[in-house]
Amino acid sequence: MRGEFGIGSAAQYGSADLKKAVHVNENFRRANFTSADMRESDFSGSTFNGAYLEKAVAYKANFTGADFSDTLMDRMVLNDANLTNAVLVRSVLTRSDLAGAIIEGADFSDAVLDLPQKLALCKYASGTNPITGVNTRVSLGCGNKRRNAYGSPSSPLLSAPPQKMLDRDGFCDSETGLCDAK
């Protein structure tokens, strides 16, 4: 059994040529796919928890039902990839390209996406993830004025409502009621 403490693959696929490979329902937990060429491969039903896929190219790859929870997918190319019913909870997808990706039923809850990419996905996002029960549009924050107003987790200064304000002497502002301290 490979991997750290026998609980994952921890396999090294960095810069590997995986074009048109078939790895259905496999465990790639904590594996390294940095800069791997995964074009037109089939990874449907596979688990990638905690894996590294930064700069990987997965053009037209099939990730139907794959679990990408807590995965680093920074600068990944996912053009025309099939992410139907995939779980991308807490994944980091900054500077990744998902143009034309099929995301029906995908769960992006707490995932970090660039705002332009998120807005592009919201134009056609649909479905509900059968594993988590979360609606794809809800997980992306589509149409949520409050969430859009504060940005995304990738913008920490804008990702939460403003902190409670104190006046210049360190006391609560009684006019706005923004502080509970006495």
Model segments located where?
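Tandem repeat scaffolds
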Residues: 1-182
